[in-house]
Amino acid sequence: MKMTIDNISEKKGVPEGIWTKCKKCDYILLQKDFEENLMVCPKCGYCTRLSARKRIEFTVDKGSFKEMDEAIQPVNFLCFPGYSDKIKKSEMSDAVVTGEAKINGYSVVIAVMDFEFMGGSMGSVVGEKIVRAIEKALKKKRHVIIISASGGARMQEGTISLMQMGKTSAALAKLADNRLAFISILTDPTTGGVAASYAMLGDINIAEPKALIGFAGPRVIEQTIRQQLSEEFQRSEFLEKHGMVDIVVERKNIRDVLTKALTFFYNRQCFLKF
């Protein structure tokens, strides 16, 4: 008999939630061990998608995160069918969480996208919160970290969502003019208008292993060119090989790499070598 989470629990009388299964390879392990490994499968290395709150928890120094602009809410200004209901049903205000934090003592402004809110899509609130985060960084002379996880621009907001591409990119240009760094972390997936704007504009572009990164998805490209793409196409390792990503970093090592980068950007007295 094939072992599943259900029959393991039935046989041993184990309460629900004790076991979990990798979505990629079906490997079964204890939920506690899975969480301690930062939701990465120890067998195949698959990086399970994380909520913005969970990612902040293991990325920044404990107790250092101070959220900003959490009260901003999306509005269905186009009266798009079903959009208002989706907003009301969600427990989140929108697809990004922003705030000030410290990473190994270095002060930063951080924005983390959450794929659980409408596929991490970028609408007016996402664009506004990211721009406000950058403006806060400019005011306080802090470097910026954005962790992306998004399917692209939010269709329910039409051209207003597309406008956020230029809006966020312009804000990052101001950051660069003031000699402040932007570190971009690309997670699975980072696609569409987010990939075509701020996500790929980092002074350092870091990606998690096997993350899907690109504008159009592989299925759309295959249907357009009528050719089958390789499995590695648009994955982070492929982009690193072709110069679009600076470094692919395992989730457990993200803090160490960010510390090295921040040491370089704040002190300017060392060579940056990963």
From Swiss-Prot:
Residues binding Zn(2+): C22, C25, C41, C44
PANTHER family listed in its UniProt record: ACETYL-COENZYME A CARBOXYLASE CARBOXYL TRANSFERASE SUBUNIT BETA, CHLOROPLASTIC
Metal-binding keyword on record: yes
GO cellular component, as recorded: acetyl-CoA carboxylase complex
Complex and partners: Acetyl-CoA carboxylase is a heterohexamer composed of biotin carboxyl carrier protein (AccB), biotin carboxylase (AccC) and two subunits each of ACCase subunit alpha (AccA) and ACCase subunit beta (AccD).
E.C. code: 2.1.3.15
Keywords: ATP-binding, Cytoplasm, Fatty acid biosynthesis, Fatty acid metabolism, Lipid biosynthesis, Lipid metabolism, Metal-binding, Nucleotide-binding, Transferase, Zinc, Zinc-finger
Domain CoA carboxyltransferase N-terminal: 18-274
Predominant subcellular localization, coarse grouping: cytoplasm
Pathway note: Lipid metabolism; malonyl-CoA biosynthesis; malonyl-CoA from acetyl-CoA: step 1/1
Zinc finger (C4-type): 22-44
Subcellular location: Cytoplasm
Keyword S-adenosyl-L-methionine listed: no
Main function: Component of the acetyl coenzyme A carboxylase (ACC) complex. Biotin carboxylase (BC) catalyzes the carboxylation of biotin on its carrier protein (BCCP) and then the CO(2) group is transferred by the transcarboxylase to acetyl-CoA to form malonyl-CoA.
Cofactor: how bound: Binds 1 zinc ion per subunit.
Broad class of enzyme this protein falls into: transferase
Family matches, as PROSITE patterns: COA_CT_NTER
Family in the record: Belongs to the AccD/PCCB family.
Organism (species): Endomicrobium trichonymphae
Required co-factors: Zn(2+)
Protein name: Acetyl-coenzyme A carboxylase carboxyl transferase subunit beta
Example of a GO biological process term: fatty acid biosynthetic process
Catalytic function, reaction form: N(6)-carboxybiotinyl-L-lysyl-[protein] + acetyl-CoA = N(6)-biotinyl-L-lysyl-[protein] + malonyl-CoA
GO molecular function: acetyl-CoA carboxylase activity; ATP binding; carboxyl- or carbamoyltransferase activity; zinc ion binding
